[in-house]
Amino acid sequence: MALIGVLANLLILCLSYARTAPDRIIGGLECNQNEHRSLVLLYNSGGFFCSGTLINHEWVLTAAHCNRENIQIKLGVHNIHVPNEDEQIRVPKEKVCCLGTMNCTQWNQDIMLIRLNSSVNYSTHIAPLSLPSNPPSVGSVCRVMGWGTITSPEVTYPEVPHCVNIQILHKELCEAAYPILLGNSNILCAGKLLGDKDSCKGDSGGPLICNGQIQGIVSWGGFPCAQILEPGVYTKVFDYIDWIQDIMAGNANVICPGDNF
């Protein structure tokens, strides 16, 4: 009952604010080319399907449900139809999920590391994103980005990545919207209570960036996207720091963080 009261009060506050707030498209506005140097495009013969984040010369972080056959990774992309001079293409040398490459799952432990077949050269449009030093606090304003649809439920895929600011919300808000999350501690709940800003179809695997660090990985949410009291669900990267660092260091017998999901 207490949670219902909190949700009701928050909704009233947001509705009062909405009278003066302009409408926004899903995904916000076109990203500045300088702000998504770590963002990578995942595609195969079927076309683009996910994003990911470059975290060093050899490794990309993305969502486990983005696992596909014959993945190619394109770095340094802005307009998908107009190549940058410093674009680079890599393929996976190794893919690592919490439950093994053959057991990547869409909802639980939605995180995957891709080791690239050769080292990436940093350049004007290519640079890594830092891993988190601390978890984000509720209320933090963070930025999500990707080439996902900018309309919903109809889909409109842009040629350039879009960026939008959203907030870290209480996990209980996501649990209220999606009861399947009860007991899962390895997620972040982020968005806007009014639902006017959100990640959406095609943004999967991309970063949620807070203070210059990757704090979340786009995982899933309601559809149509950007609905009232239906925030996005993001993999909480901070909970996987030890796992990520152990994998990149080549340590054996790596244990993924457990949960009760």
Swiss-Prot record:
<feature type="disulfide bond">
    <location>
        <begin position="98"/>
        <end position="256"/>
    </location>
</feature>
<feature type="disulfide bond">
    <location>
        <begin position="200"/>
        <end position="225"/>
    </location>
</feature>
<feature type="active site" description="Charge relay system">
    <location>
        <position position="110"/>
    </location>
</feature>
<keyword id="KW-0964">Secreted</keyword>
<keyword id="KW-0732">Signal</keyword>
<keyword id="KW-0325">Glycoprotein</keyword>
<feature type="disulfide bond">
    <location>
        <begin position="142"/>
        <end position="210"/>
    </location>
</feature>
<keyword id="KW-0378">Hydrolase</keyword>
<dbReference type="GO" id="GO:0006508">
    <property type="term" value="P:proteolysis"/>
</dbReference>
<feature type="disulfide bond">
    <location>
        <begin position="174"/>
        <end position="189"/>
    </location>
</feature>
<dbReference type="InterPro" id="IPR009003">
    <property type="entry name" value="Peptidase_S1_PA"/>
</dbReference>
<feature type="glycosylation site" description="N-linked (GlcNAc...) asparagine">
    <location>
        <position position="121"/>
    </location>
</feature>
<dbReference type="GO" id="GO:0005576">
    <property type="term" value="C:extracellular region"/>
</dbReference>
<dbReference type="GO" id="GO:0004252">
    <property type="term" value="F:serine-type endopeptidase activity"/>
</dbReference>
<feature type="propeptide">
    <location>
        <begin position="21"/>
        <end position="24"/>
    </location>
</feature>
<feature type="active site" description="Charge relay system">
    <location>
        <position position="204"/>
    </location>
</feature>
<dbReference type="InterPro" id="IPR018114">
    <property type="entry name" value="TRYPSIN_HIS"/>
</dbReference>
<keyword id="KW-1199">Hemostasis impairing toxin</keyword>
<dbReference type="GO" id="GO:0090729">
    <property type="term" value="F:toxin activity"/>
</dbReference>
<keyword id="KW-0645">Protease</keyword>
<comment type="similarity">
    <text>Belongs to the peptidase S1 family. Snake venom subfamily.</text>
</comment>
<comment type="subunit">
    <text>Monomer.</text>
</comment>
<comment type="function">
    <text>Snake venom serine protease that may act in the hemostasis system of the prey.</text>
</comment>
<dbReference type="InterPro" id="IPR001314">
    <property type="entry name" value="Peptidase_S1A"/>
</dbReference>
<keyword id="KW-0720">Serine protease</keyword>
<dbReference type="GO" id="GO:0030141">
    <property type="term" value="C:secretory granule"/>
</dbReference>
<keyword id="KW-1015">Disulfide bond</keyword>
<dbReference type="InterPro" id="IPR043504">
    <property type="entry name" value="Peptidase_S1_PA_chymotrypsin"/>
</dbReference>
<keyword id="KW-0800">Toxin</keyword>
<protein>
    <recommendedName>
        <fullName>Snake venom serine protease</fullName>
        <ecNumber>3.4.21.-</ecNumber>
    </recommendedName>
</protein>
<feature type="signal peptide">
    <location>
        <begin position="1"/>
        <end position="20"/>
    </location>
</feature>
<dbReference type="Pfam" id="PF00089">
    <property type="entry name" value="Trypsin"/>
</dbReference>
<feature type="domain" description="Peptidase S1">
    <location>
        <begin position="25"/>
        <end position="249"/>
    </location>
</feature>
<dbReference type="InterPro" id="IPR033116">
    <property type="entry name" value="TRYPSIN_SER"/>
</dbReference>
<keyword id="KW-0865">Zymogen</keyword>
<feature type="glycosylation site" description="N-linked (GlcNAc...) asparagine">
    <location>
        <position position="103"/>
    </location>
</feature>
<feature type="disulfide bond">
    <location>
        <begin position="31"/>
        <end position="163"/>
    </location>
</feature>
<feature type="glycosylation site" description="N-linked (GlcNAc...) asparagine">
    <location>
        <position position="117"/>
    </location>
</feature>
<dbReference type="InterPro" id="IPR001254">
    <property type="entry name" value="Trypsin_dom"/>
</dbReference>
<feature type="disulfide bond">
    <location>
        <begin position="50"/>
        <end position="66"/>
    </location>
</feature>
<feature type="active site" description="Charge relay system">
    <location>
        <position position="65"/>
    </location>
</feature>
